[in-house]
Amino acid sequence: MEFILVTPQAQPGVALIQLNRPKELNALNLQLMQEIRDALKALDEDDAVRVVVITGNERAFAAGADIKQMAGKTAIDMLITDQFSTWDQIRKFRKPLIGAVSGFALGGGCELAMTCDMLVASETAQFGQPEIRIGTMPGAGGTQRLTRAVGKAKAMEMVLTGEFISAWEAHRVGLVNRVVPVGQYLEEAYRLAATIAAMSPVAARLAKESVNRAFETHLDEGLHFERKNFYLTFASEDQKEGMAAFVEKRKPAFKGR
């Protein structure tokens, strides 16, 4: 049984990955995570795909890890399974990745949402890292990405209390880009994806790399990395096309080269 649905051309240049364990509120078991990893790898290599949207359903983006699968495991079991290698590979996805969130995004679901470059949330969305309530803590980026997104004070509060925050609170603290009425989250994510898909894929990939580097290094090294990627855009056909189109007052036709 497959736990995700993949539509490579849901919109021109935009692929959709939909989590598909509705009875379990899209709880993230090992198979589902491996399917996401494999789908992203295939989409990363597909030149027709420029942006990927990942979503769940109205009730839940993903309500956390599959606790039934994890409950009996020991520390040694978790080390041997090495489930986090899958998360590391998802993190390395090079194209823009947009999360479309409705309902619960909790625990591993919140961590999966935070691997996205941008998030669109329904008004019904709730975000949280409630692992402490069951005697554990975030292990797939919840302490690191959340702190980078919302700051130490809010991250510490969410991680130590296990309390959820609403879509509007997530927007206020910088976790979410856009909040939309119920039922419009996927449409808005497609709209955002279409805007990005119309840009140069070369520039988008290099720009994504550069923004992410800002959280991984000191300023001087980050500026050096940014400058290197800026120079690389001038080795692309897209840069020539983009500037020619600007001068000629027409829309550019980017090819991703």
Q: For the regions a protein language model found, what residue spans apply to each?
A:
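Generic structural signal for alpha-helix termini and adjacent loop/cap motifs
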Residues: 22, 46, 73, 236-237, ...
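Hydrophobic alpha-helical membrane-association signature
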Residues: 32-35, 82, 112, 185, ...
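Conserved CoA-thioester-binding segment of acyl-CoA-metabolizing enzymes
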Residues: 1-57
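Terminal peptide-recognition signature
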Residues: 17, 21, 36, 54, ...
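Short, charged, surface-exposed hinge/linker loops at domain edges
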Residues: 208-217
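Crotonase-fold acyl-CoA enzyme core
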Residues: 91-204, 231-236, 241-244, 248-250, ...
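Glycine- (often His-adjacent) and acidic-residue-rich active-site loop
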Residues: 3, 41, 48, 56-92, ...
